Swiss-Prot record:
Position of the signal peptide: none
Keyword Phosphoprotein carried by entry: no
GO cellular component: DNA-directed RNA polymerase complex
Enzyme Commission identifier(s): 2.7.7.6
Annotated source species: Treponema pallidum (strain Nichols)
Protein name, UniProt field: DNA-directed RNA polymerase subunit omega
Catalyzed reactions: RNA(n) + a ribonucleoside 5'-triphosphate = RNA(n+1) + diphosphate
Recorded family membership: Belongs to the RNA polymerase subunit omega family.
Subunit structure: The RNAP catalytic core consists of 2 alpha, 1 beta, 1 beta' and 1 omega subunit. When a sigma factor is associated with the core the holoenzyme is formed, which can initiate transcription.
Keywords: DNA-directed RNA polymerase, Nucleotidyltransferase, Transcription, Transferase
Length: 67
């Protein structure tokens, strides 16, 4: 599975934020050996990015405590 570049180009949000979300999701998929990886030939980052950009997986920014 190749991530559709057009979807990335048209993204209007914070690209750093969604990249961090996709990275975290890739870690989660790899850690639990999610069955979706078998369907996609083991492409963890592509699977995670597709899930985050398509809205299959929601993410939120947690407030950081200072001090």
């Amino acid at each position: 599975m190749i991530f559709p570049m057009q979807q990335l180009i048209e993204f209007q949000g914070n690209i750093y934020e969604i990249t961090c979300a996709a990275t975290r999701r890739a870690f989660q998929l790899a850690a639990v050996c999610d069955p979706v990886l078998d369907e996609l030939g083991g492409k963890v980052v592509s699977a995670a990015a597709q899930q985050v950009f398509s809205g299959t997986v929601d993410y939120r920014i947690e407030p950081q405590e200072l001090g």
